[in-house]
Amino acid sequence: MSIDRRSFIAGTAAVAAQFGFASRVYAEDKIVRFTIAQDFTRIYTFVTSEYNQGQRDYFALVNERGGVGGYKIVADVTDHANDLPRAIEAYERGKREGAVLIDPLSTPVARALVPRALEDKINMITAYSGRSDAADGTAFPYVLPLSINYWTQAGLIIENFKKTEKGSLKGKKIVFVHIDTPFGKEPLSILQVLAQKEGFELLTFPYTPPGNDQSAIWPQVRRARPDFVIFWGAGVGQTVALTEAIRNGLPMDRVSSSVWLSESDMDVVGRDAAKGVMKVEPCVGGREPKVIKDILAEVVAKGKGAGPEAKVGTAYYNYGVQMGALMVEGVRLAAAKAPNGPVTGPWLNDGLRSITNFTAEGLLPPTTVTREDHQGGGMGRIARWDGAKFVPVTDWFAANQDVVWSEIKKNSETFKTTGK
């Protein structure tokens, strides 16, 4: 997939219009500009392509309907390839062009950009990535996960395991297989606290990124005879981990992932072989949500979709719609407060931090973002793969938020003091 510096002005056939040209064509429109600099070519690949497709299709839907609050959405899409110099270049270019938001969809990139976003007052969206302590809006006013962070996801998984064991994990053995990066290591602190609190034994097995070869790890996991397994990665690491878990005979109904597992992963692993595996689900999957049906009817059917129609409704696609909808809701609220702008980072920030009980017409659990809580409430659910789709096995719920917020506050206070 080749992605270069483009402006995607959703709702037109000119989705590949060059950046400057697009700006001139729409000079008569009031616009809000987003920098969508993501990794299309190195590690996250199809994760990014589906997520980005969902975002752009949602922006197209909004613009086809005339925009939001009198504004059109302009999304400048570029490939940073998970490379910090390229990501910083994209960030700085967006800043020069008036972007008020960036979505890098990468933990190392998001971590590197935190000081710039805070200093420049440009809203950085860190959906399912970045620093978990960015949920503390008092420490990170311009870093907004708008989604359940790593720590919350780990807490949800453990709570579901506990429910499976009829309310007690005492004496149980839980294995955590993870990519050996900050993203992969981040849940460890919460898992360690919960191991002490709930009385289970935690065994950890890191693997070298990107995770192409995990053959030495999974026989060790099998020999450990765990009661449950959590595997934690993204992109190729996830499919390799799941393939090895199956090969080593681990029962899929005792294996769970974070949010980073999708239908595309199942196609690689084998849809039938993976039956029973679980994941954290942050929004509704499939094509039943009203907003997905609207995209199909008003964007895709008109030939204005941003990618293959077959990907519409996949997990990663719907994550992109989810985050696009939250961004646009922030614009709507900002425009309601100050219809004539000026469109700045603080202007949008005021809107994003006013989101209240937002569900995108049933796509996501009720989400409320405040100046204190940038996570949005901490709700998710557990879904199980049935061979064709992920089927929810719980309602939306929050779990272990006392432990999660204790960790958030501990780390955010350190950031306030040291900047690290």
Label the predicted regions:
Residues 304-317, 328-394, 419-420:
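Segments of small-molecule ligand-sensing domains
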Residues 1-20:
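N-terminal secretory signal peptides and thylakoid transit peptides that target proteins
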Residues 244-322, 396-400, 411-418:
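Extracellular/periplasmic periplasmic-binding protein-like sensory domains
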Residues 35-56, 78-84, 106, 177-186, ...:
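Extracytoplasmic "Venus flytrap"
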Residues 22-37:
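C-terminal segment of N-terminal export signals and the immediately downstream linker at the start
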Residues 94-106, 125-127, 175-177, 225-235, ...:
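Periplasmic-binding protein-like
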Residues 86, 132-133, 141-249, 286-293:
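Extracellular/periplasmic Venus flytrap/periplasmic-binding protein
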